[in-house]
Amino acid sequence: GDVYKRQEIKKEISSFKKDGKRVPSLSIVLVGNHTASSIYVNAKVRACKDVGIDVNLINLNDNISELDLLEIISELNNKSDLDGFIVQLPLPPQVNVQNVIDSISPAKDVDGFTNDNIGSITSEVKKLLPATGLGVMTLIERYNIDIESKSCAILGSSRNVGAAIAQMLMQKEQVTVTVCNSKTKNLKEITSNADIIISAVGKPNLVTSDMVKEGAVICLLYTSPSPRDDL
């Protein structure tokens, strides 16, 4: 699914160039040297370069003040030749994450984390939906996975990922969704009865074979430090 989508985007951007149009541009703000964040960001940079998106990585020191970070975001909001940007999470403790998200222009919010964009999940007018959830829905559509009247277990209840995916699924199809978190006691029982399992906690090996019934569809959301052909 990912390969075909990239080919489509690459072809579309190539047509922009042929028509003399500006190619899409993206900035990624990375604060500090968080290992997992660096892995995610590097994957995003590679994906952008692969399809021809003009990508710019902005590396900031982890001792940056919230005010200074908000000033940088304001500059990105007002940059006319920039189509969108991402502020990679997590952020250092001196920075209020919600303040940062709230400061991002919804029109440039590529991750789809602002209240305006997340709120549009349940609206008739869809805006920039949370990117991970949109990716999951695209995979379901591309592989023609029938989810109508099926049961789906989502592992992870974060507002921007797990909860957002649950909302998208319930908006699109008649699917029964169970959202699990770290306090869920009967996790194995829930997953063993699920037709679809979506692990949205960013950890490999969380779902084991004894937790899955035969014929179930499994979607694992995480980036491995080393590429694997079986994912």
Short names for language-model regions:
Residues 1-4, 222-231:
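Single conserved hydrophobic/aromatic residue that forms the stacking wall/gate
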Residues 87-152:
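Anion-binding alpha/beta catalytic cores of soluble intermediary-metabolism enzymes, centered on
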Residues 2-18:
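Positively charged, low-complexity intrinsically disordered leader regions
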Residues 37-43, 130-206, 217:
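Glycine-rich phosphate/diphosphate-binding loop of Rossmann-like nucleotide-binding domains
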Residues 32, 57-66, 182-184:
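Short beta->alpha junction loops
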Residues 49-60, 177-179:
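Short beta-strand elements in bilobed, periplasmic/extracellular small-molecule ligand-binding domains
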Residues 214-224:
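ADP-ribose/adenylate-binding Rossmann-like module
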